[in-house]
Amino acid sequence: CGSSKSNDDELVVYFVPSRDPKEIQSATAPLADMLKEELAKEGFEFKNIRIEVGTSFEAVGEALESGTAHVGFIPGGTYVLYENGADVALTATRLGLNHDSDNPADWNKAPTENTEKQVAYYRSLVIAGPSEKGQALAKKINNGEKLTADDVKNVTWGLSSNTTSPAGYIYPSLWLQENFGLSLTDLPNKVALDNYATALTQLA
């Protein structure tokens, strides 16, 4: 929840653009009426509840900090950067996956599917694309070989343009540093990914 600077007649709820904003707006359209009804039961009556999708993860954090957003669904990385202007109201869980290994080859043995187990974390996956270089890395991994710093420097990386995105930016940064002693600035070839939903399309 963001700053207390608000019009009591309206509640503004923001989502980060983790996928196509139009898809998020369509999926969350019923949320306004649901919130209005449930909040009224708790004594919070709003004339209008507005659902918005930010232009970036950071834009949602800034909206919370400035008070133009009253509630935001944000990842932990965004919260860390904007915690002075926001308080945690709820934390979410999600369905886990049937693969939960630190060995990347394990993920390639069978399709990844949801399980019924609720988890409070999620993983970031480094996906090798269909290009010759991408498939060479995938073959090396599936053969049980370890990648080298030269391996990862000699390919083009797709990274989230949202620098507070855990899966798209923060976790890959940590992985590169811990495994190869590299930072993102050490990668000579990088392209910005729009969001999670279009990332694989861009990779292809």
Task: Describe each PLM feature range.
Residues 74, 91:
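Short beta-strand and adjacent tight-turn residues that come in two discontinuous sequence segments
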Residues 2-4:
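Bacterial signal peptide processing site
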Residues 7-24, 48-53, 154-159:
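Short, well-ordered beta-strand elements
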Residues 13-14, 20-47, 174:
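Short, polar/charged alpha-helical segment
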Residues 52-72, 80-86, 195-204:
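Short helices/loops that flank or line small-molecule/ion binding pockets
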Residues 28, 32, 36, 61, ...:
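Extracytoplasmic/secreted envelope proteins and their assembly/folding machinery
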Residues 94-165:
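A conserved helix-loop-strand patch within extracytoplasmic ligand-binding domains
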Residues 153-204:
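Pocket-lining segment of extracytoplasmic ligand-binding domains
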